[in-house]
Amino acid sequence: MRTHYADKVDSSLIDQTITLCGWVHRRRDHGGLIFIDLRDREGLVQVVCNPTESTVFKVAESLRNEYVIKVTGKVHKRPEGTVNPHIPSGEVEIAASDITLLNKSKPLPFNIDEYQEVSEEVRLKFRYLDLRRPEVAQRLKMRSYIIREIRRFLDERGFLDIETPMLTKSTPEGARDYLVPSRTHPGQFFALPQSPQIFKEILMVAGFDRYYQIVRCFRDEDLRADRQPEFTQLDLEMSFVEEKDIQQLMETMIRHLFSTFLNVPLPDPFPRITYDEAIKTYGTDRPDLRNPLTLVDVTDLMKSVEFKVFKEPANNPHGRIAVLRLPKGAELSRKAIDDYTQFVGIYGAKGLAYIKVENIDNGTGGLHSPILKFLPENVIAEILKRTQAQSGDILFFGADKAKIVNESLGALRDRLCADLNLYEGQWKPVWVVDFPMFDREDVGDWQALHHPFTALQETDPEKVIANPGDVLSRAYDMVLNGSEIGGGSIRINDIGMQYAVFKVLGISKEMAEAQFGHLLMALQFGSPPLGGIAFGLDRLVAIMTGASSIRDVIAFPKTQTAQCPLTNAPAQVETLQLETLGLKVSKHRK
């Protein structure tokens, strides 16, 4: 029906007759002429309707926003002073010789042709209209281009695109599974995969050497901001590799994507920091390195002070005291400090002690704080020295269990940087390495920090069982501007070590065989050294397009309550369907 898309209409087509199809983005009457902005997938073109073309003009008079039309006409240069430099077709317009009305539109629930605040519920209910917005459509187009380039990059490097099952077995991977009842095997269930982890390892045992997949994953997680019950991963696995092989390849890919689509050079190589360094310095294992603020540990200085708020955590083996220095922060008002105190309370902090450094040259006389009277002068002097405090700064203190201090001051660090726009640079990638293999609260069972198939730096299974808290894994996360965009590891390919990890996690041999028997069997038939990584594709695209949420780069996302306003899913089903599956719905328990 058409000869061109809007973005291909330019001055090279002047005096040619072309045909366009699309929607009426905007219609304007000016001085006896009717101007129509025709919108298609690729952009906008201005169409001019002259009263001398009576049939065309009559159709144009009847048009409203979002009517679907086909326009044929000759390309003309726009009159002087009317050029629009912001669109590819901005130097020309179409003098319509024929307009066909292909379909009408009901009155719109919200405007598409201009910016308007619309609730997410309404946007998602009428997602087909929301997706017509050029800025929304552009993100999905960018997503498609990024995926296409990822495939090309990996195809050229010998990777095979292999699909893994969507209907698989429920295994304990952290989040709850989405279960699918089997009609042919009553009382038994498939699970939708949380990741292709086990299958991709088995593919390496099978000898495929380099695998990748753009794959849907499903996790029935508790509701959290900016999470989706179904999401997309770039998943890959390689044989006969070590950490550096995977990291170098993935750095090259990410650098290529940013150079290609954003014209942004990323560092070569990406910096690396250990998990321990990240937690101690930034309070998180996902540090935003654009943020110049850091945490400084002063636990050792507080072991002998009389101030119980500091002394108790300083002498608790699970405690920590850290300081966050904000340059020029002494200007903060009491209200601002109270607001930040309330903010860190979200993360379990019981308060937010502070010292304002009004004049560093006057010793304690140049300081202002309610806690000064509780601290010896030599301790205060060492705090100022260690934090490199300057006149005009403010020092915020966190004192509690290390987890609370890290999370609260880490969040405060991010909040202060955002509030005061302290960012240095635009893009700061980093690898976080040397993660603990196992983690637990003060008391409780050990859990795998990543997953139980992660290889360990310790090679003796007996030492792993004896001292699990001392064992580091061979895992690595790629973090960009405070978001983890990829995470992976070298995998265990030794059956004895795999059983040792299961033992630490409290998984008996019988339970392991029942849950992971297919993988454990495969490991005994010549498993190569292997490793891989998975990227959250939604997150990566959101970052690259500047979207505020991953929902903005997914065509049909769920809400934060895991519902689809467009289709009203999830929904009840007919009783007969349940009976066929041997299911009965019990009364919902809140």
Curated annotation (Swiss-Prot):
Q: Briefly, what is this protein's role?
A: Aspartyl-tRNA synthetase with relaxed tRNA specificity since it is able to aspartylate not only its cognate tRNA(Asp) but also tRNA(Asn). Reaction proceeds in two steps: L-aspartate is first activated by ATP to form Asp-AMP and then transferred to the acceptor end of tRNA(Asp/Asn).
Catalytic activity entry? tRNA(Asx) + L-aspartate + ATP = L-aspartyl-tRNA(Asx) + AMP + diphosphate
The GO terms describing molecular function are: aspartate-tRNA ligase activity; aspartate-tRNA(Asn) ligase activity; ATP binding; nucleic acid binding
| PROSITE patterns documented for this protein | AA_TRNA_LIGASE_II (PS50862)
For the site Important for tRNA non-discrimination, which positions are given? H30, G81
Q: Name one GO biological process term.
A: aspartyl-tRNA aminoacylation
Question: Which region ranges are annotated with the description Aspartate?
Answer: 197-200
Describe its assembly.
Homodimer.
Main subcellular location of this protein, as a coarse class: cytoplasm
What high-level taxonomic lineage is stated for the organism?
Answer: Bacteria, Pseudomonadati, Pseudomonadota, Gammaproteobacteria, Legionellales
What name does UniProt use for this protein?
Answer: Aspartate--tRNA(Asp/Asn) ligase
Q: Enumerate the SUPFAM superfamilies for this protein.
A: Class II aaRS and biotin synthetases, GAD domain-like, Nucleic acid-binding proteins
- The UniProt record lists the EC number as 6.1.1.23
Q: Which GO terms describe its cellular component?
A: cytoplasm
The residues that the entry says bind ATP are R219, D220, E221, Q228, E484, G536, L537, D538, R539
Q: Which family does it belong to?
A: Belongs to the class-II aminoacyl-tRNA synthetase family. Type 1 subfamily.
Q: Which HAMAP family match?
A: Asp_tRNA_synth_type1
Q: Name one Pfam family in it.
A: GAD
Q: Where does L-aspartate bind?
A: E173, R219, H450, R491
> Which EC class does it fall in?
ligase
- Top-rank taxon of the source lineage equals Bacteria
